[in-house]
Regions:
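Glycine-rich nucleotide-binding loop
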Residues: 192-194
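Stable alpha-helical structural segments in soluble proteins, enriched in small hydrophobic residues
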Residues: 2-11
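C-terminal nucleotide
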Residues: 10-16, 23-35, 41-188, 198-238
Length: 238
């Protein structure tokens, strides 16, 4: 996103909305062959908590090949949803880094090559779980957010077992186990297979203790502050 902003500044251009920033970055990543959801770009553009549904990749690839960037900036992107959310005031979030990088593209290739019906079933269940998390945000239910995060983790473990993949590495499993000991729920973040895990809990109670326990296990606490989301002046949707 910083590269996009630097290029805009260099050419004296302005992206007036977070959605425009997202679209520019998403088009660049698609041209580079990225297979991820592009959700990280939405978070960079908007900030804060988001409910995100990825755009129709087939449509985006075909349209990007046959239309100008300006044309895509002005169009609605099918399936794309970027909705700012506000977290319950008692929701606590920690992110831990296991010290091992991971590749989203490589993992997606393995899933699509091996999964078939199981992969599609996972996608359907994951969509339902994410929708439940969204509803928990809307009602301010921190405990439901924790519970649904745990559900999503179990979906990942099922698809991991079905495909003999390495989504939850031993280090990530330890991250989760430690989090649960301090009344948090946790799961791998992003592609899995290494990298980071995210933990959510309720209230300030054991947050510091969890951070200390992670660090004792060789898990690096990622310092972060989740700001208020920007309110878009145009809607992202279909």
């Amino acid at each position: 996103m910083a590269v996009i902003q630097a290029l805009l500044a260099f050419y004296g251009l302005v992206a007036k909305t977070p959605l425009m920033h997202y679209k520019l970055a998403a088009m660049a990543m698609m041209r580079l062959g990225s297979k991820g959801s592009l959700a990280d770009l939405a978070v960079n553009a908007y900030g804060g908590w988001l409910y995100y549904v990825a755009p129709d990749r087939v449509w985006l690839q075909e349209t990007l090949a046959n239309h100008s960037i300006l044309s895509l900036l002005s169009q609605d992107w099918p399936s794309l949803v970027i909705q700012p959310m506000f977290a319950p005031t008692d929701l606590e979030v920690l992110v831990g880094w296991t010290g091992v990088p991971a590749s989203t593209d490589n993992l997606i290739d393995q899933w699509q090559d091996r999964s078939g019906t199981a992969y599609q079933s996972f996608l359907s269940s994951a969509k339902e779980t994410v929708q439940a998390i969204k509803e928990a945000f809307e009602t301010g239910d921190s405990l439901a957010i924790q519970s649904r995060l745990a559900d999503y983790r179990h979906l990942l473990l099922q698809i991991e077992k079905h495909n003999t993949l390495s989504i939850e590495t031993p280090a990530l499993r330890e991250l989760v186990t430690i989090a649960q000991a301090y009344q948090f729920e946790a799961k791998s973040s992003g592609a899995g297979g290494g990298d980071c895990g995210i933990a959510v809990g309720q209230g300030q109670g054991l947050k510091k203790e969890l951070a200390t326990a992670w660090q004792a296990a060789g898990i690096t606490l990622v310092e972060l502050e989740i700001g208020a989301p920007q309110r878009p002046s145009e809607e992202a949707g279909n």
